[in-house]
Curated annotation (Swiss-Prot):
The gene is FTL. GO terms for molecular function: ferric iron binding; ferrous iron binding; iron ion binding. This is Ferritin light chain. The modification N-acetylserine is found at S2. Belongs to the ferritin family. The keyword Metal-binding applies. Its main location: cytoplasm. Stores iron in a soluble, non-toxic, readily available form. Important for iron homeostasis. Iron is taken up in the ferrous form and deposited as ferric hydroxides after oxidation. Also plays a role in delivery of iron to cells. Mediates iron uptake in capsule cells of the developing kidney. Delivery to lysosomes by the cargo receptor NCOA4 for autophagic degradation and release or iron. Keywords: Acetylation, Cytoplasm, Cytoplasmic vesicle, Iron, Iron storage, Lysosome, Metal-binding.
Protein backbone atom coordinates (compact mmCIF):
# COMPACT_ATOMS: atom_id res chain seq x y z
CA UNK A 1 0.00 0.00 0.00
CA UNK A 2 1.28 3.43 -0.93
CA UNK A 3 1.92 6.02 1.76
CA UNK A 4 -0.16 9.17 1.95
CA UNK A 5 2.87 11.18 3.12
CA UNK A 6 5.32 10.01 0.46
CA UNK A 7 6.69 12.89 -1.61
CA UNK A 8 9.82 12.98 -3.77
CA UNK A 9 10.97 9.63 -2.35
CA UNK A 10 11.81 7.21 -5.13
CA UNK A 11 11.41 3.45 -4.83
CA UNK A 12 15.10 3.13 -5.78
CA UNK A 13 16.10 5.25 -2.79
CA UNK A 14 13.71 3.30 -0.56
CA UNK A 15 15.31 -0.01 -1.62
CA UNK A 16 18.82 1.40 -1.19
CA UNK A 17 17.96 2.58 2.33
CA UNK A 18 16.75 -0.93 3.19
CA UNK A 19 20.04 -2.39 1.90
CA UNK A 20 22.01 0.16 3.94
CA UNK A 21 20.00 -0.75 7.05
CA UNK A 22 21.00 -4.36 6.44
CA UNK A 23 24.66 -3.35 6.07
CA UNK A 24 24.50 -1.52 9.40
CA UNK A 25 22.87 -4.48 11.14
CA UNK A 26 25.49 -6.84 9.69
CA UNK A 27 28.24 -4.51 10.90
CA UNK A 28 26.64 -4.40 14.35
CA UNK A 29 26.47 -8.20 14.41
CA UNK A 30 30.12 -8.44 13.36
CA UNK A 31 31.24 -5.93 16.00
CA UNK A 32 29.26 -7.81 18.64
CA UNK A 33 31.15 -10.97 17.62
CA UNK A 34 34.46 -9.11 17.79
CA UNK A 35 33.60 -7.52 21.12
CA UNK A 36 32.81 -10.76 22.85
CA UNK A 37 35.72 -12.59 21.21
CA UNK A 38 38.19 -10.17 22.81
CA UNK A 39 36.36 -10.43 26.13
CA UNK A 40 36.88 -14.21 26.29
CA UNK A 41 39.05 -15.55 29.11
CA UNK A 42 41.62 -16.97 26.65
CA UNK A 43 41.96 -13.64 24.80
CA UNK A 44 41.39 -11.21 27.72
CA UNK A 45 41.73 -7.86 25.95
CA UNK A 46 38.86 -6.10 27.68
CA UNK A 47 39.56 -2.67 26.18
CA UNK A 48 39.52 -4.07 22.64
CA UNK A 49 36.28 -5.89 23.41
CA UNK A 50 34.76 -2.69 24.78
CA UNK A 51 35.83 -0.76 21.66
CA UNK A 52 34.08 -3.22 19.35
CA UNK A 53 30.96 -3.53 21.52
CA UNK A 54 30.59 0.27 21.44
CA UNK A 55 30.80 0.11 17.64
CA UNK A 56 28.13 -2.61 17.61
CA UNK A 57 25.81 -0.25 19.48
CA UNK A 58 26.63 2.69 17.18
CA UNK A 59 25.87 0.64 14.05
CA UNK A 60 22.58 -0.62 15.48
CA UNK A 61 21.63 2.97 16.30
CA UNK A 62 22.55 3.95 12.74
CA UNK A 63 20.20 1.28 11.39
CA UNK A 64 17.42 2.62 13.61
CA UNK A 65 18.10 6.19 12.47
CA UNK A 66 17.77 5.07 8.83
CA UNK A 67 14.56 3.19 9.59
CA UNK A 68 13.04 6.24 11.29
CA UNK A 69 13.94 8.37 8.27
CA UNK A 70 12.40 5.72 6.00
CA UNK A 71 9.11 5.98 7.91
CA UNK A 72 9.20 9.78 7.98
CA UNK A 73 9.54 9.86 4.21
CA UNK A 74 6.68 7.42 3.63
CA UNK A 75 8.93 4.52 2.68
CA UNK A 76 8.50 0.98 3.92
CA UNK A 77 11.10 -0.90 5.92
CA UNK A 78 11.92 -4.24 4.39
CA UNK A 79 14.03 -6.40 6.68
CA UNK A 80 16.52 -8.60 4.89
CA UNK A 81 18.39 -11.58 6.35
CA UNK A 82 21.43 -10.43 8.31
CA UNK A 83 24.48 -12.40 7.27
CA UNK A 84 26.57 -13.86 10.09
CA UNK A 85 30.09 -12.54 10.63
CA UNK A 86 32.71 -13.91 8.25
CA UNK A 87 34.47 -15.73 11.09
CA UNK A 88 34.11 -16.71 14.73
CA UNK A 89 37.79 -16.59 15.71
CA UNK A 90 39.34 -13.18 15.07
CA UNK A 91 42.99 -13.77 15.94
CA UNK A 92 45.09 -10.81 16.98
CA UNK A 93 43.91 -7.25 17.45
CA UNK A 94 45.76 -6.23 14.27
CA UNK A 95 43.81 -8.78 12.19
CA UNK A 96 40.52 -7.74 13.77
CA UNK A 97 41.20 -4.04 13.22
CA UNK A 98 42.05 -4.70 9.56
CA UNK A 99 38.74 -6.55 9.15
CA UNK A 100 36.91 -3.71 10.91
CA UNK A 101 38.52 -1.08 8.68
CA UNK A 102 37.43 -2.99 5.58
CA UNK A 103 33.91 -3.24 7.00
CA UNK A 104 33.82 0.52 7.62
CA UNK A 105 35.11 1.31 4.14
CA UNK A 106 32.31 -0.85 2.69
CA UNK A 107 29.75 0.94 4.87
CA UNK A 108 31.14 4.30 3.82
CA UNK A 109 30.87 3.29 0.16
CA UNK A 110 27.25 2.28 0.75
CA UNK A 111 26.57 5.71 2.26
CA UNK A 112 28.31 7.46 -0.63
CA UNK A 113 26.35 5.41 -3.17
CA UNK A 114 23.08 6.28 -1.44
CA UNK A 115 24.06 9.96 -1.36
CA UNK A 116 24.84 9.84 -5.10
CA UNK A 117 21.48 8.18 -5.76
CA UNK A 118 19.75 10.85 -3.68
CA UNK A 119 21.50 13.56 -5.70
CA UNK A 120 20.56 11.88 -8.98
CA UNK A 121 16.92 11.65 -7.87
CA UNK A 122 16.88 15.29 -6.67
CA UNK A 123 16.28 14.30 -3.04
CA UNK A 124 17.91 17.06 -0.98
CA UNK A 125 16.33 15.83 2.25
CA UNK A 126 18.09 12.46 1.94
CA UNK A 127 21.43 14.07 1.09
CA UNK A 128 21.16 16.46 4.03
CA UNK A 129 20.20 13.59 6.34
CA UNK A 130 23.22 11.51 5.29
CA UNK A 131 25.59 14.47 5.55
CA UNK A 132 24.37 15.42 9.03
CA UNK A 133 24.08 11.96 10.56
CA UNK A 134 26.50 9.60 8.82
CA UNK A 135 29.16 10.79 6.40
CA UNK A 136 31.36 12.83 8.75
CA UNK A 137 31.11 10.23 11.53
CA UNK A 138 32.15 7.50 9.11
CA UNK A 139 35.23 9.38 7.89
CA UNK A 140 36.30 10.08 11.49
CA UNK A 141 35.90 6.41 12.41
CA UNK A 142 37.92 5.27 9.38
CA UNK A 143 40.69 7.70 10.39
CA UNK A 144 40.60 6.44 14.00
CA UNK A 145 40.85 2.81 12.85
CA UNK A 146 43.70 3.72 10.50
CA UNK A 147 45.54 5.33 13.42
CA UNK A 148 44.94 2.24 15.56
CA UNK A 149 46.30 0.03 12.76
CA UNK A 150 49.43 2.18 12.45
CA UNK A 151 50.09 1.86 16.18
CA UNK A 152 49.36 -1.87 16.19
CA UNK A 153 51.82 -2.39 13.33
CA UNK A 154 54.46 -0.41 15.23
CA UNK A 155 54.00 -2.71 18.20
CA UNK A 156 53.93 -6.00 16.26
CA UNK A 157 57.60 -6.83 16.61
CA UNK A 158 59.14 -9.99 18.04
CA UNK A 159 56.96 -9.70 21.14
CA UNK A 160 53.66 -9.03 19.36
CA UNK A 161 51.56 -10.21 22.31
CA UNK A 162 53.20 -7.63 24.55
CA UNK A 163 52.61 -4.95 21.93
CA UNK A 164 48.96 -5.97 21.67
CA UNK A 165 48.61 -5.80 25.44
CA UNK A 166 50.25 -2.37 25.61
CA UNK A 167 48.03 -1.05 22.81
CA UNK A 168 44.95 -2.27 24.64
CA UNK A 169 46.07 -0.80 27.97
CA UNK A 170 47.36 2.53 26.70
CA UNK A 171 44.93 3.25 23.87
CA UNK A 172 41.63 1.52 24.55
CA UNK A 173 41.39 0.91 28.29
CA UNK A 174 38.68 2.98 29.97
CA UNK A 175 39.24 2.09 33.65
Amino acid sequence: MSSQIRQNYSTEVEAAVNRLVNMHLRASYTYLSLGFYFDRDDVALEGVGHFFRELAEEKREGAERLLKMQNQRGGRALFLDVQKPSQDEWGKTLDAMEAALLLEKNLNQGLLDLHALGSARADPHLCDFLENHFLDEEVKLIKKMGDHLTNLRRLSGPQAELGEYLFERLTLKHD
